[in-house]
Amino acid sequence: MRIILLGAPGAGKGTQAKIIEQKYNIAHISTGDMIRETIKSGSVLGQELKKVLDAGELVSDEFIIKIVKDRISKNDCNNGFLLDGVPRTIPQAQELDKLGVNIDYIVEVDVADNLLIERITGRRIHPASGRTYHTKFNPPKVADKDDVTGEPLITRTDDNEDTVKQRLSVYHAQTAKLIDFYRNFSSTNTKIPKYIKINGDQAVEKVSQDIFDQLNKR
């Protein structure tokens, strides 16, 4: 099973990706995680990527395809994989097609923009552990302090409202074209994947079950 998982920033697709990975025993390939690891390394490339993300822009197609190509060649992808964060553009989709990557399903977790903005701007992070809180939906016991260590929580630099709105604008523009691209796939060597749209403004368990119900119809 080969899945592309779509969802705007804050839609909860990262959570769903982990659940799908465990349910179907397929590899979760998150370009976001791989990019964050590169940034954390402090390398020249990492610094360049940080500037791009802080501005609310997208990472280059060339870089994304390179890391995905390397990743899907690993043995744990033999049973299938879930692509999280790629493809985001038509050129990325075309490059995947050239690599012979056939996709079975496109699953989009859909949440209204106003709810996404509220979700993202309220996020607070404990840098050392990665623990995530929310000022409204999952507040720490003490405001702006990690529950376990008592250390200060931070807001990611790209979680401010202006940057979030820019990211959503880019996402919608790119995703609409991407879905049309796959719906109109004419490659003789590639089957047309099934497009599934899921309401993401529900409990995590309900979103997961809706996804499973659709995938199990195959």
Swiss-Prot record:
User: What reaction does this enzyme carry out catalytically?
Assistant: AMP + ATP = 2 ADP
Please give the Gene3D superfamilies that the UniProt record associates with this protein: P-loop containing nucleotide triphosphate hydrolases
- Location in or out of the cell: Cytoplasm
Q: Name a biological process GO annotation.
A: AMP salvage
Q: Which residues bind ATP?
A: G10, A11, G12, K13, G14, T15, R123, T132, Y133, Q202
Q: Which GO terms describe its molecular function?
A: adenylate kinase activity; ATP binding
* This protein's GO CC annotations: cytoplasm
Task performed by this protein: Catalyzes the reversible transfer of the terminal phosphate group between ATP and AMP. Plays an important role in cellular energy homeostasis and in adenine nucleotide metabolism.
Record note on quaternary structure:
Monomer.
Record's domain comment?
Consists of three domains, a large central CORE domain and two small peripheral domains, NMPbind and LID, which undergo movements during catalysis. The LID domain closes over the site of phosphoryl transfer upon ATP binding. Assembling and dissambling the active center during each catalytic cycle provides an effective means to prevent ATP hydrolysis.
Assigned protein family: Belongs to the adenylate kinase family.
According to UniProt, the name of this protein is Adenylate kinase
Q: Which organism is it from?
A: Francisella tularensis subsp. holarctica (strain LVS)
State which gene encodes it: adk
